Amino acid sequence: MKKVKIIMIVMLTGIFSLHIRAQSVSTGLDLVSTYVWRGTKLSGASIQPLLQFTKGGFSIGSWGSAGFDGFLEMDLFARYAFNFGLTAGLTNYYFPGTNYFDYSKDTGSHGYEINLGYNMQGFSVSANYMLNEAGGAKTAGGDKYFELGYTRKNISLFAGAGDGWHTPTGEFGVVNLGLSATKELLISETFRVPVKLSAILNPTTKQYYLTAGITL
């Protein structure tokens, strides 16, 4: 629990210190028909805001999802992108409705995950590892997720597998197979809206999703 508190303090301190000397501040807002994360449906139609501070290859910020069905998720993240395609980071998952300051194993509300990714000429691979067990966040500790992807022009293919909170039983399985396509929707001569469509199959839960999203 003490280690988890230290991680949280470091992340929050980083947000404020980077805010002071940030070279780039970016915001974003996505509207999605269904919130599907790593092959699992977490909520229906959702609004997903982003606030990010960037300095060189380092970025830190907060991302959230607010579903019209009441589902809420508010995350903190920090990551560094190296110039040879490697990205390393840490994500703090939090789901409002639980005590934000509860870091215990039985009822803790935060899940801390190490994130590694590598991209090269359209190919991508990522590995993620959950550091802690937290009953409130439903993490088992040691949860793993791996994903392979390939992007060509506006089409992306992906395949992901994981265990822990990624599957109903906690056993390792393929959970995220799919295809995404992006296109800019012309609203006027000066205004375009990026649109993303995704077809997602979860072989473990035997569920299929077709989702749509726009970025404002």
Annotate each PLM feature.
Residues Q23-F68, N128:
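Short glycine/proline- and aromatic-enriched beta-strand/turn motifs that initiate or cap beta-hairpins
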Residues S156-I187:
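Outer membrane beta-barrel transmembrane domains
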Residues V4, F58-N83, T87-S104:
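Surface-exposed loop and membrane-interface regions of Gram-negative outer-membrane beta-barrel proteins
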Residues W37-A45, W63-M74, F101-H110, M130-D143, ...:
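Solvent-exposed loop/turn segments connecting transmembrane beta-strands
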